[in-house]
Amino acid sequence: MMKTKNLIVLLSILFFSCQEEIKLTYTPISDKVLETAVIYEANIRQYSPEGTFKAFTKDISGLKELGVKIIWMMPINPISEIKRKATGGSFTSEIEDKEERKKYLGSYYSVSDYKAINPEFGNKDDFKELIDTAHDNGMYVIVDWVPNHTGWDHPWITSHPEWYTQNEQGEIIDPINPDTGKSWGWTDTADLNYDNLDMQQEMINDLKYWVTNFNIDGYRMDVAHKVPPVFFNEAITELKKIKPLFMLAEAEQQELFRNGFDMQYAWEGHHILNNIAKGEASVKEFDTYINKQKELLEPTDFTMNFVTNHDENSWSGTLKERMGDASELLTTLVYAMPGMPLIYSGQEYDLNHRLKFFEKDSIPKTKGNTWNLLTKLGDLKNNHLAFHGGKIAASYERLTTENENVVAFKRSKEVAEVYFIGNLSNQVQSFILDVEGTYEDLLLNKSLILNQKKIQLAPWQYYLLNKVSP
């Protein structure tokens, strides 16, 4: 009898140990991977006509052409039906026509169950196949997590109302802007109460579930600046006991780096690029931003740079709408500057319409100029030391042009160097650059001789150069 009890105890220990640690059959994500990575935001609903995991999985091997090493999945969980939103901001419950109501699928960020799969995309086996396929192709998968709020039919609403923020009448409320005391407008969600430690522990358990059972490689934390950093410190510490992970914060909050995150958004930099394209900012604002980042961030901190993402595309406009003729230059710039570049679903196929957020839509699938550009840039990011942008990034040196509309800088690491020179305006610009030698244009495969003579650039023209000889 004693032997039987001991065996049961031993098996229990082994079982629970397996729940906390998993044996990896592939090389886990590492700082070395982050140096050379391109990250891809996968909008499963809109990626294909089917809008499924299976349809996306078929294309994973093709993403290698773009240099993609990390796939960020927009939320994979089921979406609440209570207070589900329709295009235009109304609730679907306010739509009388049943057929019209059906077409509104709701916001990914109104989660009804943290441990379930949105049936719109497929099932758990389909998701496992997606992850395995990514790993087989040398890529890693992170999942978009919504820690700040849930949908209104999440089980916690009824089982643990104390886990939510409540007003003076004891009613659960949607997230409030602390600066105004008014709703953010996310009325299809219920605000979680991080003063409740039981809720925090259950959240950590749910986060562990996807790492342990599906072998995902990390998380992108939605509105991370709205959640106490101390929670992330505890959660990420626990998660990284299971396996190495990559953590992305949708925030610009330096404190989050000290609490477990590897990368944060470059929202400020992105808005500066938008303004440059509109003629409302110049190289001066770009330089100020780069210098500010150097002052605020530690050498191992880095940002995600982008010209588009799901928020920008759906709510602010397409790349062409926002950046116009500057689109190609600015796309190249986010690869050349320190950090990790992002590709959003459809960007690689010259997506030129705003994807619907609450209903089905689809991206184009014809390879054109942007695919060719991103293929070249992805290859450079993966293989050229001077493009390294993670925790041991290539250095950044600003070069003098004495023209407030022309930016020039050098990135270097070990013996590798790359030069970016760009006209950030819609007017012809002339300048002198204190650089000499023969250079190769890495995108055009042409030679260029620089000899400190006046250089002229057409509107939005740029060079991406590799030094060939003195």
Protein language model regions, located:
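Bacterial Sec-dependent N-terminal signal peptides
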Residues: M1-K23
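Carbohydrate-interacting/catalytic domains
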Residues: C18-N43, S48-W72, P78, M323-G324, ...
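Substrate-binding/active-site clefts of carbohydrate-active enzymes
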Residues: E21-Y40, R45-A55, I60-K69, P75-F214, ...
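Hydrophobic faces of well-ordered beta-strands that scaffold small-molecule active sites
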Residues: V38-Y40, I71-M73, V141-V143, Y219, ...
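Soluble or luminal CAZymes and related metallo-dependent hydrolases
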Residues: T52-A55, G122-D126, D198-M203, V227, ...
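Short, solvent-exposed turn/loop segments enriched in Gly/Ser/Thr/Pro and often Arg
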Residues: W72-E81, D144-H154, D222-P228, E250-E255, ...
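Active-site-proximal helices and loops of the catalytic beta/alpha 8
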Residues: D206, T212, D222-T303, L333, ...
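Active-site clefts of carbohydrate-active enzymes
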Residues: P299-E321
